[in-house]
């Protein structure tokens, strides 16, 4: 009987540890989710690749929720694109970051702009959420592909406000280098 009583306290300890494992694992996952969904000051980030979106990480198959900015940061310089995940609606943005605002230039590709309607150089809000303001548009290049034409438009003035955006744990959208090739325009 003495031998069994020695195992009883050890069994209780093991049962307690095993029962607590799923709870502590779950709390770690919830804690990690909270950290990913906290607004972050972009200027304070180290050099690297990032993705910020206007809505928290959907935790499903989607690459992002709301409107997103996928970018590379080096010092106070950023190079990336701002747009809607799973769509062809995006604008390349590069510039200087100050707190949660990027000030610099924008680049877009537009299909089939009528010759009589060149881009307007006046300031306008690009997105429905009104985070990206563009102005001073210039046509850089027009390329004809079969019967369609693609026009590259440079916006000499771009201002992107990312206040309140959420940092995702890793970039999941298309890499910046595949969409924003500033030198080839």
Residue ranges and their predicted role:
Residues 44-52, 75-81, 102:
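Short, hydrophobic/aromatic-rich segments at coil-to-beta transitions
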Residues 60-94:
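N-terminal glycine/threonine-rich, aromatic-flanked beta-hairpin/loop signature
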Residues 101-185:
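Beta-sheet ligand-binding and adhesion/scaffold domains
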